[in-house]
Amino acid sequence: MEHYEHVITSIVAMVVALGVVLAAGKPKIMPSKLQFVIESYINFCKSMVTENMGEQGLRYLPLIASIGLFVFFGNVMELLPFVDAPTGNINTTLALTLIVFFLYHFEGFRVNGLGYIKHFMGPIKALAPFFFIIEIMSHLGRVVSLSLRLFANMKGGAILLISIIGVLIGNPFTLAVSPIVLVFLITIKVLAIVLQAFIFMILSTIYIAGAVVHEEH
């Protein structure tokens, strides 16, 4: 069962994210605090995609917003005792990365047709085969870097936090200051949780933009 814990926690993260959105309800003249937070988040995501892709970026707004919520709540689960965060498992981060990877290539061909292949050929025709190989390696590298970045940061952060807590509560000399240190560490961890969700979102947006936005020459 422990081998599938990341699947269970992933489902929980998705359910929580969906529940938060549904709890916000329909837009109102006087929005609740939760609705204000959700609307602010959606506006932030909207600004992100339109700045990188223009109005056509709105097509990808649901995807980017959903990715952000999933990664955020997946990361938050790391703060729960005896729970392995789904984003601290390489299978989860790799699956999420592959969704983005295949989607932006699909969209690249949908928008540009076979002309999308020119993105891999470089500016010099004589060196096209060389550039093609380099670009393929670069795109595959995105899968590795995007999935490992999130996994390593969340897994490493969890191990470090547990280790420090163990040292604090296991030593009578540090036990007295442990509450202050713990508050500081948790604050830093929360900032890291938000930052990692943002990084995954912005990189996903940039990768999609690179595939669908026509460059001006």
From Swiss-Prot:
Could you tell me the keywords of this UniProt record? ATP synthesis, Cell inner membrane, Cell membrane, CF(0), Hydrogen ion transport, Ion transport, Membrane, Transmembrane, Transmembrane helix, Transport
Which terms in the GO cellular component ontology are assigned?
plasma membrane; proton-transporting ATP synthase complex
* Membrane topology (UniProt): Multi-pass membrane protein
A single GO molecular-function term is: proton-transporting ATP synthase activity, rotational mechanism
Concerning PROSITE patterns, the annotation shows:
ATPASE_A
One BP term from GO: proton motive force-driven plasma membrane ATP synthesis
The record's listing under InterPro entries reads: ATP_syn_F0_a_bact/chloroplast, ATP_synth_F0_asu, ATP_synth_F0_asu_AS, F0_ATP_A_sf
Which cellular compartments is it found in? Cell inner membrane
> Mind telling me which residue stretches traverse the membrane in this protein?
5-25, 63-83, 89-109, 120-140, 157-177, 191-213
In which family does this protein belong, per the annotation? Belongs to the ATPase A chain family.
NCBIfam families linked: ATP_synt_6_or_A (TIGR01131)
Q: What does this protein do?
A: Key component of the proton channel; it plays a direct role in the translocation of protons across the membrane.
Assembly: F-type ATPases have 2 components, CF(1) - the catalytic core - and CF(0) - the membrane proton channel. CF(1) has five subunits: alpha(3), beta(3), gamma(1), delta(1), epsilon(1). CF(0) has three main subunits: a(1), b(2) and c(9-12). The alpha and beta chains form an alternating ring which encloses part of the gamma chain. CF(1) is attached to CF(0) by a central stalk formed by the gamma and epsilon chains, while a peripheral stalk is formed by the delta and b chains.
According to UniProt, the name of this protein is ATP synthase subunit a
Q: Which organism is it from?
A: Hydrogenobaculum sp. (strain Y04AAS1)
Q: What is the lineage of its organism?
A: Bacteria, Pseudomonadati, Aquificota, Aquificia, Aquificales
